[in-house]
């Protein structure tokens, strides 16, 4: 594993050059913002959740995003199919357990999906990650009520059980597998006031996973790119509304100098 400003910039250029197709089965709230962020970083988004076409879509995609934000029975069936096909084709699956712990149905659905087809990467906030391991943990909607540090032991358990890279997002992003750990400290507090930026991070990570076979590197690079863009974008905005627009512009124009001057990462 090698994660630094040079490798991050290398992968940003690779995403821009290769424009990987990222297949998203995601929620209604974030479809537009997620697609725009993927376009801004240089990837090609597709939002397809019809059970009748997900196998074909996964076949041509570079990676798969499963985001359970707005659950329905039909979407869950499509998620099962898409994950099985991606696993069969050895394509990265990036899973976002939105609101895990909020309701029994939501938590059980997540556990069934990842038990049947373990994902390559799981990205969630600390409450969501802990809810997948500990009974009785409650989340407040999709917002975390726990510190990211408190979820590290739960993340280690999940990684061991499913063989996945686990990303606990927060003010500091903790990324680990069974052998490696990295901490990303980029971002800005105002990013929490823009709905869907966590879900967007999951999709951006999937773009990097499509071009880098190291899931640890891909996760760290994706989270760092999001955080750096958020930091720069927040410098000259009045509030969350203008941040959302400026974030996309910054992600699009992110430069090698930006990466080298802003990256805060500890491996």
UniProtKB/Swiss-Prot annotation:
GO BP: any one term: thiamine diphosphate biosynthetic process
Pathway(s) served: Cofactor biosynthesis; thiamine diphosphate biosynthesis; 4-methyl-5-(2-phosphoethyl)-thiazole from 5-(2-hydroxyethyl)-4-methylthiazole: step 1/1
Signal peptide range: none
InterPro entries per record: Hyethyz_kinase (IPR000417), Ribokinase-like (IPR029056)
Chain residues that bind substrate: 47, 196
Assigned keywords, A-Z: ATP-binding, Kinase, Magnesium, Metal-binding, Nucleotide-binding, Thiamine biosynthesis, Transferase
EC number: 2.7.1.50
Catalytically driven reaction(s): 5-(2-hydroxyethyl)-4-methylthiazole + ATP = 4-methyl-5-(2-phosphooxyethyl)-thiazole + ADP + H(+)
Catalytic EC class: transferase
Function: Catalyzes the phosphorylation of the hydroxyl group of 4-methyl-5-beta-hydroxyethylthiazole (THZ).
Family classification: Belongs to the Thz kinase family.
Full protein name: Hydroxyethylthiazole kinase
Species whose genome carries this gene: Chloroherpeton thalassium (strain ATCC 35110 / GB-78)
Gene name for this UniProt entry: thiM
